[in-house]
Swiss-Prot record:
The gene is acpS. Mg(2+) binds at D8, E57. It catalyses: apo-[ACP] + CoA = holo-[ACP] + adenosine 3',5'-bisphosphate + H(+). It holds the Pfam family ACPS. Transfers the 4'-phosphopantetheine moiety from coenzyme A to a Ser of acyl-carrier-protein. This is Holo-[acyl-carrier-protein] synthase. HAMAP family: AcpS (MF_00101). Its cofactor is Mg(2+). GO terms for biological process: fatty acid biosynthetic process. Belongs to the P-Pant transferase superfamily. AcpS family. It comes from Methylorubrum extorquens (strain CM4 / NCIMB 13688) (Methylobacterium extorquens). Keywords: Cytoplasm, Fatty acid biosynthesis, Fatty acid metabolism, Lipid biosynthesis, Lipid metabolism, Magnesium, Metal-binding, Transferase. It is found in: Cytoplasm. SUPFAM superfamilies: 4'-phosphopantetheinyl transferase.
Length: 136
C-alpha cells in the first residue's frame, strides 16, 4: 500500500548560488558526508547537489512532515543500490516518523527517481508498505 508520495522541482541555479555564497556552511548543513563526497567528485557539482536537494524535499513531503516535526535535512541521504538505482537512507527523526507510518506486519520500501534538465532538477519519492513474509 502507498503511504506517501512526494515530488519536488528545484532550480539548479539556486543551488549553485548557495554553493558559491555559503560553500561548506551550506553543504554541511544540508548534505551527509557521503552525499558531499559524491557531488564534489563531479565536474558539474550544481546539478548533482540540486537532484539530492529535490530528493530530500520530496521525501519530507512523502513523510507528510516537511522540514519539521523532528525531520532534518541530514536525516535523509540519497544513496545508490549496487545496481546504481538511487534510493534513500533515513536516520534520526525521518526514520522515526517513517516507523510510525508503517502498519504492523509491514515493512517500508522507499522508491526514488531523480532527473535534471537544466535549469531544473526533479525528484519523486513513493513510500510503500509491503507485508512482511516469513522466509523458509
Amino acid at each position: 500500500m502507498i503511504l506517501g508520495i512526494g515530488t519536488d522541482l528545484c532550480d539548479i541555479r539556486r543551488i549553485e548560488s548557495s554553493l558559491e555564497r555559503f560553500g561548506d556552511r551550506f553543504t554541511h548543513r544540508v548534505f551527509t558526508d557521503g552525499e558531499r563526497g559524491k557531488c564534489d567528485r563531479r565536474a558539474a557539482r550544481g546539478p548533482s547537489y540540486a537532484r539530492r536537494f529535490a530528493a530530500k524535499e520530496a521525501c519530507a513531503k512523502a513523510l507528510g512532515t516537511g522540514m519539521s516535526q523532528g525531520v532534518f535535512w541530514r536525516d535523509m541521504e540519497v544513496v545508490n543500490l549496487p545496481s546504481g538505482q538511487p534510493t534513500l537512507n533515513l536516520t534520526g527523526g525521518a526514520r522515526e516518523h517513517l516507523a510510525r507510518m508503517v502498519p504492523a506486519g509491514h515493512e517500508a520500501r522507499l522508491h526514488l527517481t531523480l532527473t535534471d534538465e537544466p535549469p531544473l532538477a526533479q525528484a519523486f519519492v513513493i513510500i510503500e508498505a509491503v507485508p512482511i513474509t516469513a522466509t523458509s
